[in-house]
Every structure is written in structure tokens, then in C-alpha cells.
């Protein structure tokens, strides 16, 4: 979880970059 967030769709993406 460190440095990462989870979108409402459950997709993981970097806090510093756009969802990928």
C-alpha cells in the first residue's frame, strides 16, 4: 500500500502517476 492507492473500481495505481 505504500506509495499506492486503490480506485473505486479496485484498480491499483501509483500515487505519483495516472491510473494504469
From Swiss-Prot:
One of its GO terms (molecular function) is toxin activity. Keywords: Disulfide bond, Ion channel impairing toxin, Neurotoxin, Secreted, Toxin, Voltage-gated sodium channel impairing toxin. PROSITE patterns: LCN_CSAB. It is found in: Secreted. InterPro entries: LCN-type_CS_alpha_beta_dom, Scorpion_toxin-like_sf. Residues 1-20 form the LCN-type CS-alpha/beta domain. It comes from the Eukaryota. Expressed by the venom gland. GO terms for cellular component: extracellular region. Its main location: secreted. Beta toxins bind voltage-independently at site-4 of sodium channels (Nav) and shift the voltage of activation toward more negative potentials thereby affecting sodium channel activation and promoting spontaneous and repetitive firing. Has the structural arrangement of an alpha-helix connected to antiparallel beta-sheets by disulfide bonds (CS-alpha/beta). Belongs to the long (4 C-C) scorpion toxin superfamily. Sodium channel inhibitor family. Beta subfamily. This is Putative beta-neurotoxin. It comes from Tityus pachyurus.
